[in-house]
Curated annotation (Swiss-Prot):
The keyword Transcription applies. The winged helix domain is involved in binding to DNA in the preinitiation complex. Transcription factor that plays a role in the activation of archaeal genes transcribed by RNA polymerase. Facilitates transcription initiation by enhancing TATA-box recognition by TATA-box-binding protein (Tbp), and transcription factor B (Tfb) and RNA polymerase recruitment. Not absolutely required for transcription in vitro, but particularly important in cases where Tbp or Tfb function is not optimal. It dynamically alters the nucleic acid-binding properties of RNA polymerases by stabilizing the initiation complex and destabilizing elongation complexes. Keywords: DNA-binding, Transcription, Transcription regulation. Monomer. Interaction with RNA polymerase subunits RpoF and RpoE is necessary for Tfe stimulatory transcription activity. Able to interact with Tbp and RNA polymerase in the absence of DNA promoter. Interacts both with the preinitiation and elongation complexes. The keyword DNA-binding applies. One of its GO terms (molecular function) is DNA binding. Belongs to the TFE family. This is Transcription factor E. Residues 3-88 form the HTH TFE/IIEalpha-type domain.
């Protein structure tokens, strides 16, 4: 399941783009129950970094923990375990959000005329360009009509890809 690029991307976002998170997940999957201290030692990563990743995963409900109090020291020990059965639903939800955003962007591209400042590389709607007299508000340069056919084509490709994933990928077919 973790080999799926869409799942990897969502997990990467959840873990604030920290690649160590995948190592943490691997340790959790391979040991099934482990303390944050043991993960830190196994990966040779600072304990606070391991805890930060575990908390992010916990917020997404992808890990669970048990807390036990040491009666001698009064310290708590947290034992973490993976809870990856929620991954497909989480990825499907994020994919739907992305898909909706792409569809909104496609509608915007298809229903508007755009202008472009080649110096600043900024794209403006016709209304915004007209309001500024077809001069770039950043640099004052002339704006030129922008052909967004490639943008529309790219958006359609991305939408089709995600829709295909929903229908063809068995991980997401239930969502």
């Amino acid at each position: 399941m973790l080999e799926n690029p869409l799942i990897q991307q969502v997990l990467f976002e959840i873990m604030d783009e920290d690649v160590v998170g995948f190592d943490v997940l691997s340790v959790l999957i391979n040991t099934n129950e482990v303390t944050d201290d043991e993960i830190s030692r196994q990966l040779d990563v600072k304990l606070n970094n391991i805890r930060r990743i575990l908390y992010k995963l916990y917020e997404a409900r992808l890990v669970d923990y048990n807390r036990e109090k040491d009666e001698e020291t009064n310290w708590y020990t947290y034992t973490w375990k993976p809870s990856l059965e929620k991954v497909p639903a989480l990825v499907a939800k994020k994919m739907k959000n992305v898909l909706n955003g792409l569809k909104e962007q496609l509608e915007m591209e298809e229903t508007n005329m755009f202008f472009f400042c080649s110096d600043c590389e900024i794209k403006f709607t016709f209304e915004d360009a007209m309001d500024s007299g077809f001069r770039c508000p950043q640099c004052g340069g002339m704006m030129y009509e922008y052909d967004n056919k490639k943008d529309i084509s790219l958006l359609k490709e991305q939408i089709n890809y995600l829709e295909d994933e929903f229908t063809k990928n068995p991980l997401f077919s239930a969502y």
